[in-house]
A protein has these predicted regions:
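A detector of single, family-specific signature residues
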Residues: 1-143
Length: 143
C-alpha cells in the first residue's frame, strides 16, 4: 500500500512541492492534497487554518479578547496529519521550524508548541502551493 501511495505522490506536482517542507513526507503530503483538493478554494492561509481547525477559539467580553484552545472545527484528518508531521520538528537541528518550536515550548508547553508548529506547517503548505515554488527558509510567515 505504501508503495502505491509513494508512486502516486511521485507523480503528483502538489505532493512534490509539499514534500520540500521539513517534516512532510509522501503520506502526509497525500493527506494534504486529498483534503485541500484545490488551493484556490482558500483566499488566505488563515482560511486554510480555519478549515483544518488549527486556529484558536476567541472569547470576547466587553473590551477584552482571549484566545483559547484550537476550535477543532473542520477536517480532523488534515489536522491529525499536520500534528503528526509536527512531531518530527523537535528532532531537527537547525531548521526555522525547530527554532519556532523551541521558542513556543518555553511559553506554552510541549503539546501547545506541537499544535502551533502544525499550524506553521499549514502556513508553509499554503505558500508553497499558492506560489507553486518549493519550500524555502525565507518564506514570510509571521510567528
Amino acid at each position: 500500500m505504501t508503495k502505491r501511495i509513494r508512486a502516486i505522490a511521485d507523480n503528483n506536482p502538489m505532493a512534490q512541492l509539499l514534500m520540500t517542507i521539513p517534516g512532510i513526507g509522501y503520506i502526509i503530503a497525500m493527506y494534504i492534497v486529498a483534503e485541500i483538493e484545490n488551493i484556490s478554494r482558500f483566499p488566505s492561509y488563515r482560511r486554510m487554518g480555519s478549515y483544518a481547525g488549527l486556529i484558536p477559539s476567541l472569547r470576547a467580553s466587553g473590551c477584552k479578547e482571549r484566545r483559547g484552545k484550537i476550535t477543532k472545527q473542520g477536517s480532523s484528518y488534515l489536522r491529525t496529519a499536520l500534528i503528526e508531521a509536527a512531531q518530527v520538528i523537535p528532532r531537527m537541528k537547525k531548521s526555522k521550524l525547530s527554532v519556532f518550536f523551541r521558542k513556543r515550548i518555553v511559553r506554552a508547553g510541549y503539546q501547545s508548541a506541537i499544535v502551533a508548529t502544525a499550524h506553521k506547517l499549514l502556513q508553509y503548505a499554503y505558500y508553497v502551493l499558492k506560489n507553486q515554488m518549493p519550500y524555502s527558509e525565507e518564506y514570510p510567515v509571521s510567528a
